[in-house]
């Protein structure tokens, strides 16, 4: 085990050579800045002041080459090779309620929702604990580790993931096409979790496989007997995925699902409004002011919706919770 110490003395923890600095800090239940845990966002940047690390992904998009030359690294993409002294660059926004743990699961079933997106149902030996909205790191030996969000309410030892097979994506394609009986998971991770109070209406906005955490959060609210309006905007270019959304969310009178097709070809009968999600929301915006907003999808979608909410409609930043898929 190696000792990790930050220059401001706020972060002091131990890490072994098999753990990233980020995972080790979160296992120690420390407040540490991060978002994607996949090298894309750059939220977990550190400056290495003393010691040596193994950089798992030198070309990670979350870190510019000039920053690497300044001895900066991503905590989610480096492992310690010695005792370290570090400087944490960004300010942490909050603490997750469940420290991540490694555990084994058995693949119970796989159900395709479209040609590209599928649902994996897993079963662990122990109770799987997480907050609705969080994700898990899924390891496929020799191929890599990827982050996938839980798509079910907390339910004993079962866990449901929704995965989108990405062209040339080694992990997602292996999960889609191969018969895999067991999977190693690490989690939960993520700070964009369900925070809605009983007196506040809730709005969920997702694109593609970003639907997964929304299904978890919405169905949790339904199970809890939440009575305020729930509005879901879901965008996809595949009609099969829009149809799947209608079955993934539990039914309740206060739930309104608005599917949006981003493809005219995939919306041949024009069953759904065509365009991007952020282009459809304005016609509903007047009735949504004062809500808590939850966003999940690719960075471009998140940025467009944030602009719509904060700049054009003055929604406070504190009322917007987002998870960007990189």
From Swiss-Prot:
A single GO BP: toluene catabolic process
Domain 2Fe-2S ferredoxin-type: 1-92
Domain of life of the native organism: Bacteria
Cofactor binding note from Swiss-Prot or TrEMBL: Binds 1 FAD per subunit. Binds 1 2Fe-2S cluster.
Keywords: 2Fe-2S, Aromatic hydrocarbons catabolism, FAD, Flavoprotein, Iron, Iron-sulfur, Metal-binding, NAD, Oxidoreductase
Pathways involved: Xenobiotic degradation; toluene degradation
Chain intervals for the UniProt region annotation (Ferredoxin-reductase): 95-326
Ranges in coiled-coil conformation: none
Binding sites annotated in the UniProt record for [2Fe-2S] cluster: 36, 41, 44, 76
Cystine pairings recorded for this chain: none
Catalytic activity entry: 2 reduced [2Fe-2S]-[ferredoxin] + NAD(+) + H(+) = 2 oxidized [2Fe-2S]-[ferredoxin] + NADH
Residues in FAD-binding FR-type domain copies: 100-195
Record-linked PROSITE patterns: 2FE2S_FER_1, 2FE2S_FER_2, FAD_FR
Enzyme Commission numbers on file: 1.18.1.3
Classification via InterPro entries: 2Fe-2S_ferredoxin-like_sf, 2Fe-2S_ferredoxin-type, 2Fe2S_fd_BS, Beta-grasp_dom_sf, Cbr1-like_FAD-bd_dom, FAD-bd_FR_type, Flavoprot_Pyr_Nucl_cyt_Rdtase, FNR_nucleotide-bd
Molecular function per GO: 2 iron, 2 sulfur cluster binding; ferredoxin-NAD+ reductase activity; metal ion binding
UniProt-annotated binding residues for FAD: 146-149, 162-164, 170-172
Cofactor(s), by name: FAD; [2Fe-2S] cluster
Quaternary organization: Monomer. The alkene monooxygenase multicomponent enzyme system is composed of an electron transfer component and a monooxygenase component interacting with the effector protein TmoD. The electron transfer component is composed of a ferredoxin reductase (TmoF) and a ferredoxin (TmoC), and the monooxygenase component is formed by a heterohexamer (dimer of heterotrimers) of two alpha subunits (TmoA), two beta subunits (TmoE) and two gamma subunits (TmoB).
Annotated family: Belongs to the bacterial ring-hydroxylating dioxygenase ferredoxin reductase family.
Role played: Reductase component of the toluene-4-monooxygenase multicomponent enzyme system which catalyzes the O2- and NADH-dependent hydroxylation of toluene to form p-cresol. Ferredoxin reductase catalyzes the transfer of electrons from NADH to ferredoxin (TmoC).
Protein name in the entry: Toluene-4-monooxygenase system, ferredoxin--NAD(+) reductase component
Lineage, broadest ranks: Bacteria, Pseudomonadati, Pseudomonadota, Gammaproteobacteria, Pseudomonadales
